Amino acid sequence: MQTGLSLACLVLLCSVLGEAALRKPKRQAGATDTNGAAKSEPAPVKTKGLKTLDRGWGEDIEWAQTYEEGLAKARENNKPLMVIHHLEDCPYSIALKKAFVADKMAQKLAQEDFIMLNLVHPVADENQSPDGHYVPRVIFIDPSLTVRSDLKGRYGNKLYAYDADDIPELITNMKKAKSFLKTEL
């Protein structure tokens, strides 16, 4: 049931993203430059409902925009990449997000020691879903771009899942990801 629901959510998400990608931005009527040619000016930004890269996971954290950017920054900065897979309307994802934001140690580690990425859509790299496409799940990648399969949550059936009550376990794994990097180099 859970796998079927997750798959249905992914299919729906993909169709919505595909439809949004096909839409073209509209030009403002009457906008011309000094030669009378139409100017392509961006539409005014609406602040209500504005989506930011943090998606509520911590506004003081610098977030990578894409998986590829996160991998490049991890390698360049010699820091581990922490990828949080979630859905914005998933109650488990929402609860984990609130707990993550409320925990000062988790926020501090994320700000100082990690390249951070949160994704609401699947990536093509199957290493990001070694045991399924469930959410929320957290995957760590070291600067050599190796997925840290040893850094798991406490569940046997969903190895990389974390609940809101699992923040101490997540922090432990964040510290392991960071300290492993230092002993390895």
UniProtKB/Swiss-Prot annotation:
Induction: In response to organizer-secreted signals and neural inducers. Keywords: Developmental protein, Secreted, Signal. GO terms for biological process: cement gland development; fibroblast growth factor receptor signaling pathway. The keyword Signal applies. GO terms for molecular function: dystroglycan binding. Residues 25-45 are annotated as: Disordered. GO terms for cellular component: endoplasmic reticulum; extracellular region. It is found in: Secreted. InterPro entries: AGR/TXD (IPR051099), Thioredoxin-like_sf (IPR036249). Residues 1-18 form the signal peptide. SUPFAM superfamilies: Thioredoxin-like. Expressed in the anterior of the dorsal ectoderm from late gastrula stages onwards. Becomes restricted to the cement gland anlage at the onset of neurulation (stages 13 to 14) and expressed exclusively in the cement gland from stage 18 onwards, with transient expression in the hatching gland during tailbud stages. Pfam families: Thioredoxin_7 (PF13899). Involved in cement gland formation; probably specifies dorsal ectoderm to acquire an anterior fate such as cement gland and forebrain. Signals via the FGF pathway. Belongs to the AGR family. This is Anterior gradient protein 2.
